[in-house]
Amino acid sequence: MERIPSAQPPPACLPKAPGLEHGDLPGMYPAHMYQVYKSRRGIKRSEDSKETYKLPHRLIEKKRRDRINECIAQLKDLLPEHLKLTTLGHLEKAVVLELTLKHVKALTNLIDQQQQKIIALQSGLQAGELSGRNVETGQEMFCSGFQTCAREVLQYLAKHENTRDLKSSQLVTHLHRVVSELLQGGTSRKPSDPAPKVMDFKEKPSSPAKGSEGPGKNCVPVIQRTFAHSSGEQSGSDTDTDSGYGGESEKGDLRSEQPCFKSDHGRRFTMGERIGAIKQESEEPPTKKNRMQLSDDEGHFTSSDLISSPFLGPHPHQPPFCLPFYLIPPSATAYLPMLEKCWYPTSVPVLYPGLNASAAALSSFMNPDKISAPLLMPQRLPSPLPAHPSVDSSVLLQALKPIPPLNLETKD
């Protein structure tokens, strides 16, 4: 039975056939040649596997080193200049990494500090909201402080209005003293102080009118009304109702208004001195002074008669001196046609309707030797009192002819 060749070598126990040669068994490979061929093939396979393993490993290592070098180059470019200047020469990879680590630590500390500040601010805002000190409370405190300061300033100026050498340093010192009193918790004002407060707030809106208007020098006695009204007197002069605050003088009778009218005459000079200290370019108009002097002799007409006249317009408290003096024509005789058409049928004199005198007294009053020029200005409409006799227009014409031009006196 023939032996089938296999891939394994023959066992050593079997003896080798002596007569077998290569030519004896055609188509059969000898065992020793098969073993040699097999060993060479295994060695070649192992070498190829090692080469194929080394090739991708080298590529991977090369790529990894390239990535590391690229990242280090980018870090070197991103480093601040002051860190680059700390080292001289070429920056090595290790130096670049150290500087990067130092810079990152500094940035981390800065971010931590900012976060702590933000947290502190947020906690402070929450505490402020809880305490109730919001924007509205601050506005109310500011308004109250401003009003207190303005009240103190006006009261101080009212007390020292007659003092001509008043300085701003004195006012500032007074305000500092009041502030110290308020901070200490003491009583700052007395109960009797609201009266000068009202007077000062009335003087405040009237002060710009006397300094801004050119022909408003005739309206200077508006301060006299506030001064007399704040002192508790109901003055009967025609300057009591300049802003509509003196309308109470209408309710008084004729007897109660005459002493106030006379007392106001004595106050005119002190107020004129005060106005002269403030406004130096123009003095008190002499027309007011003449009217006050005449009031002692002819104290029959009052401001209530002048105010109650409908000639003033719809507002009964409008000041009687608001009619500019320069609008009056040079001669009062120009009003004669109007007097004949409108006022002649009524039996009331034209000049001052409050004069309760007879026709003889009126003719004596119309005498140019006794009358003053400012009184001849046509002031008001007649009152409907039928007790006076009728006056002829010839008498009025005779009384009005010797009047000098009024515009020449008002220029003084």
Curated annotation (Swiss-Prot):
Residue ranges constituting the bHLH domain according to the UniProt record: 52-107
Stretches for region Necessary for interaction with RXRA and repressor activity against RXRA: 75-79
Q: Which UniProt keywords apply?
A: Biological rhythms, Cytoplasm, DNA-binding, Isopeptide bond, Nucleus, Phosphoprotein, Repressor, Transcription, Transcription regulation, Ubl conjugation
State where composition is biased (Basic and acidic residues).
248-271
Entry's Gene Ontology molecular function annotations = bHLH transcription factor binding; DNA-binding transcription factor activity; DNA-binding transcription factor activity, RNA polymerase II-specific; DNA-binding transcription repressor activity, RNA polymerase II-specific; E-box binding; MRF binding; protein domain specific binding; protein heterodimerization activity
The covalent link annotated as Glycyl lysine isopeptide (Lys-Gly) (interchain with G-Cter in SUMO1) occurs at K279
* Region of interest (Disordered), ranges: 182-303
PTM section of the record: Ubiquitinated; which may lead to proteasomal degradation.
The compartments listed are: Cytoplasm; Nucleus
Q: Which Pfam families match?
A: Hairy_orange, HLH
An annotated GO BP:
regulation of DNA-templated transcription
The organs and tissues expressing this protein are described as:
Expressed in cartilage, spleen, intestine, lung, and to a lesser extent in heart, brain, liver, muscle and stomach.
User: What happens upon changing H57A?
Assistant: No effect on its interaction with BMAL1 or its repressor activity against the CLOCK-BMAL1 heterodimer. Significant reduction in E-box binding
**UniProt subunit comment:** Homodimer. Heterodimer with BHLHE41/DEC2. Interacts with TCF3/E47. Interacts with ubiquitin-conjugating enzyme UBE2I/UBC9. Interacts with HDAC1, SUMO1, RXRA and BMAL1.
Q: What is this protein called?
A: Class E basic helix-loop-helix protein 40
